[in-house]
């Protein structure tokens, strides 16, 4: 007979962002537990609200699956003496399996006989197994945990009730002072406590008490209600998926409603209005048919439509107060010049161990100058990025950003335009924060991309020099995110960024401009390179790149971000070539021999007069061809290296590299060093797994 089982964890209200990952965790842990316990079922259906996490398991078997297994014991020579008497080891083994020595058989494994017993394990009734779900509940983890009352146990929020019903029967267990029963709670204000007769009644019983327990169904209701309100008023509402998810996890019985605010607030930049509505009040904003922001909003109440107008009025008052503050700051901020704000940055700390924010901008200007020249900006672009670097943090000390910190950069652009700055300068100010997440939008403009790189390079270098290098999960200054941003911008713009060389140039430029911090930045360049390479590894892993290719390209001598990605693509694209194994093995042999050459030998010029066979001359010509091809990029380099593989093989067949004659040996090592240096541009090829 198939059964239905309900498990519900009743809690005080959870933070909205926790609900979805929590229910996913409960489903997975439950499924893993049932699999481990050999219990078959058809489906696990999740239910979640701010006050509950629940799973309904249907098609549940009567009991665990029976199993028969053959258990290996000690070797026969240990289990029996010469007369065939059973040893204590054999007797203890069979007793531990609930059997006797009469049940022993022998099996030979690699020439040695071992004791075996065949063991039958009857499945336990499902009711017994389900009581173990207590451990599933207590094993759950959350981003933040709390204790309550006098208990030492920690959970996301205090557990207030537990329901565990197998069909109509309660499965008894307790967590702290809460014991399972069949009683659950309806909506906090509209419903009442109820007793569930059978597990299958759960969803329907809660609906009757104003709780939509199915999160997907509740989300669909919210979306439908918002769409209807928008259609009724002729609005266009972009229902942001993230906001919809958050609102869905704040309510149990959703009722959407529309509100409005005074049109005078539309003079404020719409980013401020949207931030106030979406981020601070969790409102959905509306636009007209022309895409203009309207003085209206849609919100969702956790309740029914009773006294809804009072709810509308209350929400309008809260939003109006916030917008009134925004209008005040917007007006007051415009009474000062950008120069006034930049002056104030001289008293604002970037970090007390590093510098002020004004000093950071001076460093970033020096770095931006190096980058502008390196990536080939034209005069107008260079002028824009240098001007932006002089002022790009000014909005941090405006009243608006003080109130709406998430608008830093955005308000910088708005105020810069109002004060007559070049639009390219204003855009760069906004874009320098990008990307703000691992997959966030990237700077759209070239000056913005350069300023973003300069700002991020400065932050990482100075924090490293101050000894604040991320370790483990600890990264309070988001340096990993900034390093990822550097990598993604380089990819997006297709800019060569040799990190080691550039970092040295940055430090030199700061020193020349007399803006270098009193920190040993030069001593952190190797750490910076490795830090950037760690981010490259992560991005390549996310792209499902082969692990050996990742190891090869990031262990190579190059610190050029774009070159490393290009090398990975090239190696991956040729990995299935018929000659790939021969090419890599030949080049690896070259590299290993070249590593035996002292630095002064590797740097010497190859002398053809010292060649003793034709293969040396052919290799010499081949290396010259590869060197020429390398100037056209890594793709041409790999093709040339692959083309001379037969030449390399013939060379090794005919030539003893480590000749007794010093001059001949050093000449050969110098040749191989030239070829190895070219091959290493693709990475440490010895890391590749070739078959």
UniProtKB/Swiss-Prot annotation:
Broad class of the protein's primary localization: cytoplasm
Places the protein is found: Cytoplasm
Domain of life: Bacteria
Alphabetized UniProt keyword annotations: Aminoacyl-tRNA synthetase, ATP-binding, Cytoplasm, Ligase, Nucleotide-binding, Protein biosynthesis
Any single GO CC term annotated in Swiss-Prot or TrEMBL for this entry: cytosol
Matches recorded under InterPro entries: Gly-tRNA-synth_bsu, Gly-tRNA-synth_heterodimer
MF annotations from Gene Ontology: ATP binding; glycine-tRNA ligase activity
EC annotation from Swiss-Prot or TrEMBL: 6.1.1.14
Top EC group: ligase
Entry-linked PROSITE patterns: AA_TRNA_LIGASE_II_GLYAB
Record text on subunit structure and interactions: Tetramer of two alpha and two beta subunits.
Family recorded in the similarity comment: Belongs to the class-II aminoacyl-tRNA synthetase family.
PANTHER family in the record: GLYCINE--TRNA LIGASE, CHLOROPLASTIC_MITOCHONDRIAL 2, GLYCYL-TRNA SYNTHETASE
Protein name per Swiss-Prot or TrEMBL: Glycine--tRNA ligase beta subunit
Organism from which the protein derives: Levilactobacillus brevis (strain ATCC 367 / BCRC 12310 / CIP 105137 / JCM 1170 / LMG 11437 / NCIMB 947 / NCTC 947)
Gene: glyS
């Amino acid at each position: 007979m198939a059964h239905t089982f309900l498990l519900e964890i009743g809690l005080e209200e959870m933070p909205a962002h926790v609900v979805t990952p929590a229910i996913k965790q409960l489903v997975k842990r439950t499924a893993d537990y049932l699999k481990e316990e050999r219990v078959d079922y058809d489906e696990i259906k999740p239910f979640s609200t701010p006050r509950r996490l629940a799973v309904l398991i249907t098609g549940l078997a009567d009991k665990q699956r029976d199993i028969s297994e053959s258990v290996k014991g000690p070797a026969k020579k240990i289990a029996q003496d010469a007369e065939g008497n059973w040893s204590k080891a054999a007797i203890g083994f069979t007793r531990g399996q609930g059997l006797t020595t009469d049940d022993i058989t022998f099996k030979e494994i690699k020439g040695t006989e071992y004791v075996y017993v065949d063991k039958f394990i009857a499945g336990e009734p499902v009711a017994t197994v389900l009581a173990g779900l207590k451990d599933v509940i207590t094993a759950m983890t959350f981003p933040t945990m709390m204790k309550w009352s006098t208990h030492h146990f920690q959970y996301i929020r205090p557990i207030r009730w537990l329901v565990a019903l197998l069909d109509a029967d309660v499965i008894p267990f307790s967590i702290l002072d809460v014991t399972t029963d069949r009683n659950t709670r309806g909506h906090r204000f509209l419903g009442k406590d109820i007793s569930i007769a059978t597990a299958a009644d759960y969803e329907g019983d809660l609906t009757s008490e104003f709780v939509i327990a199915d999160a997907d169904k509740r989300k669909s209701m919210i979306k439908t209600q918002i769409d209807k309100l928008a259609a009724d008023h002729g609005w266009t509402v972009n229902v942001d998926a993230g906001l919809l998810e958050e609102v869905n996890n704040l309510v149990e019985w959703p009722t959407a409603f529309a509100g409005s605010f005074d049109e005078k607030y539309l003079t404020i930049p719409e980013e401020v209005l949207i931030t106030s509505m979406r981020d601070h009040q969790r409102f959905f904003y509306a636009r007209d048919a022309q895409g203009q922001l309207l003085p209206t909003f849609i919100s969702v109440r956790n309740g029914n439509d009773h006294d809804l107008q009072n709810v509308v009025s209350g929400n309008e008052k809260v939003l109006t107060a916030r917008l009134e503050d925004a209008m005040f700051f917007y007006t007051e901020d415009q009474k000062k010049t950008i120069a006034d704000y930049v002056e104030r940055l001289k008293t604002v700390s970037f970090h007390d161990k590093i510098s002020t924010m004004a000093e950071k901008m001076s460093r970033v200007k020096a770095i931006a100058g190096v980058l502008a020249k390196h990536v080939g900006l034209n005069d107008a672009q260079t002028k824009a990025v240098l001007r932006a670097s002089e002022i790009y943090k000014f909005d941090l000390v405006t009243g608006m950003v003080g109130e709406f910190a998430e608008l830093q950069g955005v308000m910088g652009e708005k105020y810069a335009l109002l004060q007559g700055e070049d639009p390219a300068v204003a855009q760069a100010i906004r874009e320098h924060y990008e990307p703000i997440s691992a997959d966030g939008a990237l700077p759209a403009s070239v000056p913005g991309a350069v300023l973003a790189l300069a700002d991020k390079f400065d932050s990482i270098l100075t924090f490293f020099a101050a000894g604040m290098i991320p370790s483990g999960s600890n990264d309070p200054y988001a340096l990993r995110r900034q390093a990822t941003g550097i990598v993604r911008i380089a990819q997006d713009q297709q800019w060569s960024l040799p990190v080691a060389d550039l970092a040295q140039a940055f430090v030199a430029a700061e020193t020349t401009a007399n803006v270098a911090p009193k920190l040993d930045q030069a001593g952190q360049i190797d750490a910076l390179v490795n830090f950037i390479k760690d981010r490259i590894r992560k991005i390549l892993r996310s792209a499902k790149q082969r692990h050996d290719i990742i190891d090869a390209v990031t262990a190579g001598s190059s610190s050029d971000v774009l070159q490393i990605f290009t090398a990975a693509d090239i190696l991956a694209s040729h990995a299935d070539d018929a000659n790939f194994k021969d090419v890599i093995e030949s080049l690896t042999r070259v590299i290993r021999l070249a590593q035996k050459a002292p630095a002064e030998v590797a740097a010497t010029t190859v002398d053809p007069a010292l060649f003793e066979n034709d293969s040396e001359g052919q290799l010499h010509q081949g290396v010259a061809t590869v060197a020429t091809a390398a100037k056209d990029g890594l793709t041409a380099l790999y093709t040339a290296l692959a083309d001379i593989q037969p030449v390399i093989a013939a060379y090794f067949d005919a030539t003893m590299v480590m000749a007794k004659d010093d001059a001949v040996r050093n000449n050969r090592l110098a040749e191989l060093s030239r070829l190895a240096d070219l091959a290493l541009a693709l990475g440490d090829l010895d890391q590749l797994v070739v078959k």
